[in-house]
């Protein structure tokens, strides 16, 4: 059973994302019709810096719903089922995940936690267990096929032995408002190492496309300037709110 590492790629995003956000925000406060200013936005007549500054000023007031008009789509592979179960908890998103029913898991890839990889005895036990699971999957699938359950019908029952470590692939689409919330929760040190690493890569890709919105995105402490998690859960990177003057 081969060990694998995560890979995150940005497949697509809404075209002209900054101008679209600017138009959406402006329409809320503009008596005219923003479609009439759209050519000026695309031509650069309304400068990017001006658009970004206007959006930032409105976001500071707490009005953020217009950022839902822009979305990003990512392809993610080499992540565990444990991660994807955490990922799909973010319900304001769209997901298309690799099926363990239609994809044969006889030689599944797996993800190994770094803490296990650093411990020689734990690593050896983990690797042996992955081999044992793979062997059990193949044996059960073969027995089911002998009973006439072939293809996906055998896979769908044999998959019950696959572990949380089994690697998966998934396509994820989120709008910017959902992404900002996702980064607040999953870039935080309280998030598990695997999903935090994936979130950090996703944030970097978003910043390349739309720095005006994502430059200061990330864990909540990055925006607030203090840790809101309380004394029990703080990582110490930022002071606690109650300790600030």
Swiss-Prot record:
Residues 6-220 form the ThyX domain. FAD binds at residues 65, 89-91, 97, 175-177, 181. It catalyses: dUMP + (6R)-5,10-methylene-5,6,7,8-tetrahydrofolate + NADPH + H(+) = dTMP + (6S)-5,6,7,8-tetrahydrofolate + NADP(+). The active site is at residue 186. The keyword Methyltransferase applies. A motif (ThyX motif) lies at residues 89-99. It holds the Pfam family Thy1. PANTHER family: FLAVIN-DEPENDENT THYMIDYLATE SYNTHASE. NCBIfam families: thyX. This is Flavin-dependent thymidylate synthase.
